[in-house]
Amino acid sequence: MIQNPKRYTITAALPYTNGPIHIGHLAGVYMPSDIYSRYLRLQGKDVAFMCGSDEHGVAISMKAKKEGITPQEVIDKYDGIIRKSFVDFGISFDNYSRTSAKIHHDTASEFFKKLYDKGDFIEEVTEQLYDAKADQFLADRFVVGTCPKCGNEEAYGDQCEKCGSTLNATDLINPKSTITGETPIMKSTKHWFLPLDRYSDFLTKWILEGHKSDWKPNVYGQVKSWIDGGLEPRAVTRDLDWGIDVPVAGAEGKKLYVWFDAPIGYISATKEWAAREGKDWELYWKNEDTKLVHFIGKDNIVFHCIIFPAMLKAEGSYILPDNVPANEFLNLEGNKLSTSKNWAVWLHEYLEDFPNQQDVLRYALTANAPESKDNDFTWKDFQARNNNELAAIFGNFINRVVVLTNKYYEGVVPTPNKFSEVDEATLTELKAYPAVISSSIERYRFREALGELMNVARLGNKYLADEEPWKMVKTDPERVKTQMYVALQIATALRVLCEPFLPFTAEKLNKMLKIDAKLSWNDVTTNSDLILAGHKIGEGEILFAQIEDEQIQKQIDKLEATKTANIAENKKAEPQKELIQYDDFAKMDLRVGTIIEAEKMPKANKLLVLKVDTGIDVRTIVSGIAESFSPEEIIGKQVTVLVNLAPRALRGIESQGMILMTNLPDGKLAFVNPDVAGVGNGEGIN
């Protein structure tokens, strides 16, 4: 762990440009990295916060084929969507680059060539899966099969998303091509491998011995499991038609494996930024006084803690990450987030339904971040976080301070009189919070840090509630000047301390308090007058509006519709029954009828007792449809009735027929009935 670094290089996992960004990405990677970077800048630190679009690999080619466009068109489309989402949610990258950029192609090629020239790769001809029908080798997501470790039948050729294991395509049991559905054959091909086994001792000493106390247990444990299991050579090239060409002779048709080229994207993004800003990029990657931190999700731990460090060690001139604070996964309403199944809250769609409420989502995701275990996002919790915390605690305090200052002093910060013991204690407690919040942030405990920020707002609310300036203004207006001065110091401190977490709120507070000077993090502790007497503040505005039940129900309904659609898509039709003769069918007397009465069967949850006009009579039919319909809503409904079914007693009532039904995707029943009006009761169906 580096003590007192001169600069910080912060990286956030490169998002893959085959789809938009959802709340899982934001909670797992981009919120914590943004909070950390913003906090460091408020400390006056030299920060390079780097990210960019990951634009190579099999998933891009697959998306292009699915959408009927070129890979370049795919990455251009989603790079634009992703960039906008990051801007919309205030993710403060110093540079957001692209791995399709020339500077990245050059950087990745040079990196590979240096290791190649040093003899760090193993060149080997191996047997790989090959789709003869598509005339293509099957790497990564071009092949699915059964995971040899957990039995998941939908594991990919590079990773099992169920158990998180990193795989080779040849590890899969019963592999199938995702291009044609064919069973692949084995075919020889030449590739280059990074011999990870050579770096086992280095990784053991560096991580298992050197970072046991400061790396998160979930990260340390996964890395230890990998090392203890024995590291093996890892391919760094692929047989693909999209990506960075392998820059050596005899490598025609080969591309750099996306997980070799992608982390180098952090370096090329830094080069691009440094050239633009007139800085020396090497200081941020090759200087021992620089602290390098990778923010990722748990599915990327092996790449950032084993493969990329081995690459950096092999190259020889780069620093190693000081920490890799990977998060676990965020689930949605009890189910795993899934882009393919549209089980997600997409950032661009969120803003359509909750305009200008970016900080509410930032808050809810940070408060419930999956820092040490998988966590669940629910819309009810989102609503409660806004209404009961942001609005009721934070927003309420700011509103009272601004309203009372404008009411009593026409918006001018009053000159305080002598501080009471309560005032002194409150201001002393306030000055302690920056260090408390810093301690949490610097240990990557962002949930804990956010909780301490809210305690500052609670401190302000308690101070006002105990002091009651709205009552005292009638009896001791001079005392109220001091009370409001203290409250305004807390409000200004909140403006500074909330910026890493709630940047849009911080900007609103700038306008409300008319703060022009750039206050630093440590000013809250060292500066006794964060906002000066005589300073005129602005008018108040509602920071956090109440989120109503109807808004939340709309989101829940949207997810239910998605769930229903997924059930329908995945549901397989029942196999055809045995053949019957026409005479068997002709025996059934099917007629149109109308339900004229309906009531629930006593002591039965599923049964309704119906009176049905069949055109030939009015008869009683007991039907198991009570879980799909209420009696009131089906009176007058036309239905299809099997009228010559032998009567059958159900709970003591004789049922004299059967009504034809079918199933909807959500499991409810639906009537099979005429699709036009005017069909009379008793009309036959044949």
Curated annotation (Swiss-Prot):
What top-tier enzyme class does this entry carry? ligase
> Keyword Iron-sulfur: yes or no?
no
For the ligand (ATP), the binding residues are T339
Localisation: Cytoplasm
Entry superkingdom: Bacteria
SUPFAM superfamilies according to UniProt: Anticodon-binding domain of a subclass of class I aminoacyl-tRNA synthetases, Methionyl-tRNA synthetase (MetRS), Zn-domain, Nucleic acid-binding proteins, Nucleotidylyl transferase
InterPro entries documented for this protein: aa-tRNA-synth_I_CS (IPR001412), Anticodon_Met (IPR041872), Met-tRNA-synth_bsu_C (IPR004495), Met-tRNA_ligase_1 (IPR023458), Met-tRNA_synth (IPR014758), Methionyl/Leucyl_tRNA_Synth (IPR015413), MetRS_core (IPR033911), MetRS_Zn (IPR029038)
Molecular function per GO: ATP binding; metal ion binding; methionine-tRNA ligase activity; tRNA binding
> Per its UniProt record, what Pfam families does this chain match?
Anticodon_3, tRNA-synt_1g, tRNA_bind
tRNA-binding domain mapped to chain residues: 584-686
'HIGH' region, short sequence motif: residues: 15-25
Query: Which cellular component, as a GO term, is one annotated location?
Result: cytosol
Q: What is its EC number?
A: 6.1.1.10
Q: Its catalytic activity?
A: tRNA(Met) + L-methionine + ATP = L-methionyl-tRNA(Met) + AMP + diphosphate
- UniProt xrefs under PROSITE patterns: AA_TRNA_LIGASE_I, TRBD
State its cofactor: Zn(2+)
- What is written in the cofactor note of this entry? Binds 1 zinc ion per subunit.
**Oligomeric and partner information:** Homodimer.
Entry's family note: Belongs to the class-I aminoacyl-tRNA synthetase family. MetG type 1 subfamily.
What does the UniProt function comment say about this protein? Answer: Is required not only for elongation of protein synthesis but also for the initiation of all mRNA translation through initiator tRNA(fMet) aminoacylation.
Q: Would you tell me the protein name for this molecule?
A: Methionine--tRNA ligase
